[in-house]
Amino acid sequence: MREICYTNRKKSGRNDTPFDSNQGEIRRMLARRELPTEFIEWNKRWGAPSGYPPRIGQRFWGRLLSNSARTKLAGPFSIQKNSPTRRYEYPWAFYAIPLAPGMRVVDVGGGLAGFQFVLSQAGAIVTNVDPGLCAKGRGWKCDLESVHYLNRLFGTTVELRSCTLSEASLQNNAYDVVYSISVMEHVTDGEFWETANHVWDCLKIGGRFVITVDLYLNLLPFTSRKSNEYGVNFPVGELINFKTFSLVTGDVREIYGTTAFDKERILTNLEDYSLGEYPVLAQCLVLEKQ
């Protein structure tokens, strides 16, 4: 049976209508329970999503190490607690765009998560834009001192701008990639579109917006409930038609906010998706600035 998929093409009215294709790899939009081999290997290499496991006997000899040595041993993903779905999201985001040394990238709401440091180690010039505890929604501690410390520890050069994207004064048409890993569902509706506007502004023509957004199974459109303690289900599929953004590839039936979104298909195939302790799925998509 053929999948319904979406691949990048010129716009003609609304561009979220699915069509059949037998050509090329189909990129699914919702994080899957079963990881591709390269994702498993990536997580093992970088200690994602929660840091490297303790080494043999570390419970005893680890107490002799300094805090810095223990942190370095645990790796960049040990700093900030992550959802289980990140085991899919982080390698997916890394492989979504082939990185080359010198590429300028932005990590929106990167906090102290390890992904920004992996991007830097891969040769990218990384700017993390995060207001930390000053965020209006769900914030976390993220300050210049901590980022400088982690840069020294991991041999990276991440730049932190402790503010929102609207206050970051990013150069227009200057960045190759903007990453947003599970951030947009935690902001207000106004902030969502304000952020999308600034992402579009700072990207080069042909630049990519790599985004993952939580899809809560206990909220609209699956139930009548509008919000939970973590956020809301934003119709992220509407980004496909925002300004000159275009969806690169994927199955639009799995993206909330597209006309093809199929909640029944999702609910009847829950065993295929990556689920943590909380009833949430991860939507993964790549947009290109045309």
Positions of predicted regions on the chain:
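Class I (Rossmann-like) S-adenosyl-L-methionine-dependent methyltransferase catalytic domain
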Residues: 3-96, 105-106, 112-167, 210-290
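Phosphate-coordination loops involved in phosphoryl transfer and adenosine-cofactor binding
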Residues: 101-102
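Alpha-helical membrane segments in multi-pass integral membrane proteins
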Residues: 177-178, 199-200, 209-211
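A short SAM/SAH-binding and catalytic strip from SAM-dependent methyltransferases
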Residues: 177-190
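A short glycine-rich, Lys/Arg-flanked "PGG" loop and its adjoining helix->strand segment in the class I
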Residues: 193-205
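A short secondary-structure junction signal
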Residues: 190-192, 222-223
